[in-house]
Amino acid sequence: METIVLLFLLALVFCTLEMGMVEAEHGCPDNEDECHEHCKSIGKSGGYCVGPHKQTCRCNP
């Protein structure tokens, strides 16, 4: 039972991290418009830079 709960929690964390996160090479932190355009190019509604130093491009659903 403990193994199933642990696997479920790991899967939940993995899925949460995979929701719209892309690497900093998409304009962040210097050019948030590049991040926004990248996200639109992959079918999302847009995106913005997040994180302590705004180095991660996060795409909207």
UniProtKB/Swiss-Prot annotation:
Top-level taxon of the source organism: Eukaryota
Keywords: Antibiotic, Antimicrobial, Calcium-activated potassium channel impairing toxin, Defensin, Disulfide bond, Immunity, Innate immunity, Ion channel impairing toxin, Potassium channel impairing toxin, Secreted, Signal, Toxin, Voltage-gated potassium channel impairing toxin
Sample GO molecular function, one term: potassium channel regulator activity
Location relative to the cell: Secreted
GO biological process terms, semicolon-separated: defense response to bacterium; innate immune response
SUPFAM superfamilies linked to this entry: Scorpion toxin-like
Principal localisation: secreted
Residues that span the membrane, as ranges: none
Keyword Disulfide bond: yes
Family the UniProt entry places it in: Belongs to the invertebrate defensin family. Type 2 subfamily.
Protein name: Defensin BmKDfsin2
Organism field: Olivierus martensii (Manchurian scorpion)
